[in-house]
């Protein structure tokens, strides 16, 4: 059955939900742009800030589809997010893979359901494993800039407050109404990261930890950072978790990797009163900025790409 006829039949069925039909419409467009052997990717990779170079150096053939051409996709206006979808074979086993070079965020004004639409596209295209990367601030005082953290848990603050990508009528074609998330991050995939790092003698320190999702676009205050750290978060960022929630709803296995691009300031702000009394001057330190994030991301992309290419051989 062709993609067009499949979509036509789905539209004739009144029980199908709008998210499912939209995903099929995007799929129909994409499979017209890529050869059949790449039209059913097994793995999908989402590249975070500065990590878009993960898509470079792919073995030919590589097929590029701009986000702006895909039905129901949006374009990111954040530096470091190219807004292009690539299809290529990855790893020694030439695993068909789709790579999202950049993501669009809810802080850009997009509904959270829109920011996670690419994950539902993954599902209807046949993706079994999603590898998602991000740039994050290090809350754990043992983490250094340039370290990697494999997510083993998360804290979804916007989700707890009602900004959940699964809100509204359940898109039953993808999953159940109340999906469990106690083991959202696949243990076997996490083990493969350490195996790959060892095999390729990756010198970067690799941690496992908990990621706190905040909506942004402001970086965290000192008090907010201390609160997150006290709650058990090791890193903090403005993405990933909504994608993970939708992926697990779809039954897609998840591996998520954070690159620590800055150390979050958790110390209390200096007291103006105390400084006046001791006639001292203290400079504020540690203000985060996006340029710093991009620079660290670009420097780390090669190591991340090496590990991901190795991991896909065992999926």
Curated annotation (Swiss-Prot):
Q: What is its EC number?
A: 2.4.2.1
Give the domain of life: Eukaryota
Record field: catalytic activity: a purine D-ribonucleoside + phosphate = a purine nucleobase + alpha-D-ribose 1-phosphate
- Which Cys residues form disulphide pairs? none
Task: Kindly list the positions annotated as binding a purine D-ribonucleoside.
Answer: 220, 262
Q: Listed GO molecular functions? A: purine-nucleoside phosphorylase activity
Q: Which GO terms describe its cellular component?
A: cytoplasm; cytosol; nucleus
Entry-linked Pfam families: PNP_UDP_1
Alphabetized InterPro entries for the sequence: Nucleoside_phosphorylase_d, Nucleoside_phosphorylase_sf, Pur_Nuc_Pase_Ino/Guo-sp, Purine_phosphorylase
Protein's cellular compartments: Cytoplasm; Nucleus
Quote the pathway field: Purine metabolism; purine nucleoside salvage
NCBIfam families assigned to the protein according to its UniProt record, in alphabetical order: PNPH, PNPH-PUNA-XAPA, PRK08202.1
Q: What does this protein do?
A: The purine nucleoside phosphorylases catalyze the phosphorolytic breakdown of the N-glycosidic bond in the beta-(deoxy)ribonucleoside molecules, with the formation of the corresponding free purine bases and pentose-1-phosphate. Cleaves guanosine and inosine.
> What's the protein called, per UniProt?
Putative purine nucleoside phosphorylase
């Amino acid at each position: 059955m062709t993609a067009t006829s499949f979509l036509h039949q789905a539209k004739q069925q009144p029980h199908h939900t709008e998210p499912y039909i939209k995903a099929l419409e995007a799929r129909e467009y994409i499979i017209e742009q890529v050869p059949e052997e790449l039209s059913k990717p097994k793995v999908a990779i989402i590249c975070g800030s500065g990590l878009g170079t993960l898509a470079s150096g792919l073995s030919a053939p590589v097929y590029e589809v701009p986000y702006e051409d895909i039905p129901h996709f949006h374009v990111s206006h954040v530096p470091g997010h190219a807004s292009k979808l690539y299809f290529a074979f990855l790893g020694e086993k030439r695993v068909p893979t789709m790579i999202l070079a950049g993501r669009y965020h809810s802080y850009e004004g997009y509904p959270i359901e829109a920011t996670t639409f690419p994950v539902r596209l993954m599902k209807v295209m046949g993706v079994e494993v999603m590898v998602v990367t991000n740039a994050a601030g290090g809350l754990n005082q043992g983490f250094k800039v340039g370290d990697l953290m494999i997510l083993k848990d998360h804290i979804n603050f916007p989700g707890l407050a009602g900004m959940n990508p699964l809100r509204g009528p359940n898109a039953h074609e993808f999953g159940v109404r109340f999906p469990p998330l106690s083991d959202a991050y696949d243990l076997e995939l996490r083990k493969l990261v350490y195996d790959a790092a060892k095999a390729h003698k990756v010198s970067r320190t690799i941690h496992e930890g908990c990621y706190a999702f905040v909506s942004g676009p402001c970086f965290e205050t000192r008090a907010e950072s201390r609160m997150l750290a006290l709650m058990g978060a090791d890193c903090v960022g403005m993405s990933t978790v909504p994608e993970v929630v939708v992926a697990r709803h779809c039954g897609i296995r998840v591996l998520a990797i954070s690159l620590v691009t800055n150390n979050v300031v958790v110390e209390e702000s200096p007291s103006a009163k105390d400084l006046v009394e001791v006639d001292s001057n203290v400079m504020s330190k540690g203000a985060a900025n996006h340029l710093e994030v991009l620079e660290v991301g670009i420097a780390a992309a090669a190591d991340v790409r090496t590990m991901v290419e190795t991991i896909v051989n065992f999926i």
